[in-house]
């Protein structure tokens, strides 16, 4: 049943304050299992940001660039699978986590932001909420495929990400999606957006949400922080080679970052 649109400044303010209260604690990396995949030993921190509706951990990996004495570079957060049926770009983040040492950027990776949706191969989380309509910025009450939740910041995944971004305060956030095939340039930093599009081989365009772009993560972040969050849309079937081999160095190039040429020591860890 359709519900009337409702926005409440007080509710939004309370949701923001509640979500940013407290700092998430770091946890040790999980132990290896027989189904583990190779990962380079270049992870500085493994942080559990929170849990999904079904109790699955939402994990971020902080890549270690301390060996690069020249410059730390910008702080960058890469996020994949906000929508669980848009899983291909997750391979980009897993490749960055598992390859050679990364220099010139302070990099955080969140490969599985919506682990319940990923497991079920659904856009929304286990409550049936579109996480990219649940943020307390221009939130409205939406139904159907874009169900926005009972209130702004109602979902544990949303609150976990809000706390994390409020703690890290990155210079840049790239949120990877499918299948619209383009990078939105209708934002506060169009020149940087065009740079991203060029580096990734995607069209620079205006992504029209059809009138339902309310409560988005990028909108919330860009309103509250000095940094810049950008949505990157790959196509429906970008191809495994593009995701695993081509895109990771392209992403680093955006920030003038690079990898070591020497193969790293590797260990086995479970995939996210």
Task: For every predicted segment, state its role.
Residues 185, 211-272:
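Active-site-adjacent mobile loop/cap segments within catalytic or ligand-binding domains
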Residues 1-31:
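Secretory targeting and sorting signals
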Residues 26-40, 271-272:
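Composition-driven, intrinsically disordered low-complexity tracts enriched in small residues
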Residues 52-53, 70-82, 86-207, 223, ...:
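Active-site/substrate-binding loop(s) of hydrolase catalytic cores
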Residues 41-47:
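Short, hydrophobic/aromatic-rich segments at coil-to-beta transitions
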Residues 54-63:
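A short loop-to-beta-strand scaffold at the N-terminal edge of the catalytic core in hydrolase folds
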Residues 63-66, 225:
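Active-site beta-strand termini and strand-to-loop segments that position acidic
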